[in-house]
Amino acid sequence: MSNTKTLEDNISFEEALRELEEIVKKIDNGQESLETAVNSFERGILLKNYCEKKLKEARLKIEKITKLADSTVILEETEV
């Protein structure tokens, strides 16, 4: 697991989410050293942001497809 400031785009949403879940479990367990926990937290933030970005991209793509399928569709604001 690399702790770069950005995530590579070749990781899938599912892989990022799975890694984020593992980080949360490890931090909640409280068995890591402070330094390791901080590094894990930093990686977790990157993964969270990446997952949010992917979800937003998917939502926008679905909205675009829906608009193309029916130009009269009214889209409601949704929170990601």
Swiss-Prot record:
<comment type="similarity">
    <text>Belongs to the XseB family.</text>
</comment>
<dbReference type="InterPro" id="IPR037004">
    <property type="entry name" value="Exonuc_VII_ssu_sf"/>
</dbReference>
<dbReference type="GO" id="GO:0008855">
    <property type="term" value="F:exodeoxyribonuclease VII activity"/>
</dbReference>
<keyword id="KW-0963">Cytoplasm</keyword>
<comment type="function">
    <text>Bidirectionally degrades single-stranded DNA into large acid-insoluble oligonucleotides, which are then degraded further into small acid-soluble oligonucleotides.</text>
</comment>
<keyword id="KW-0378">Hydrolase</keyword>
<dbReference type="GO" id="GO:0006308">
    <property type="term" value="P:DNA catabolic process"/>
</dbReference>
<protein>
    <recommendedName>
        <fullName>Exodeoxyribonuclease 7 small subunit</fullName>
        <ecNumber>3.1.11.6</ecNumber>
    </recommendedName>
</protein>
<comment type="subunit">
    <text>Heterooligomer composed of large and small subunits.</text>
</comment>
<keyword id="KW-0540">Nuclease</keyword>
<keyword id="KW-0269">Exonuclease</keyword>
<dbReference type="GO" id="GO:0005829">
    <property type="term" value="C:cytosol"/>
</dbReference>
<dbReference type="InterPro" id="IPR003761">
    <property type="entry name" value="Exonuc_VII_S"/>
</dbReference>
<dbReference type="Pfam" id="PF02609">
    <property type="entry name" value="Exonuc_VII_S"/>
</dbReference>
<dbReference type="GO" id="GO:0009318">
    <property type="term" value="C:exodeoxyribonuclease VII complex"/>
</dbReference>
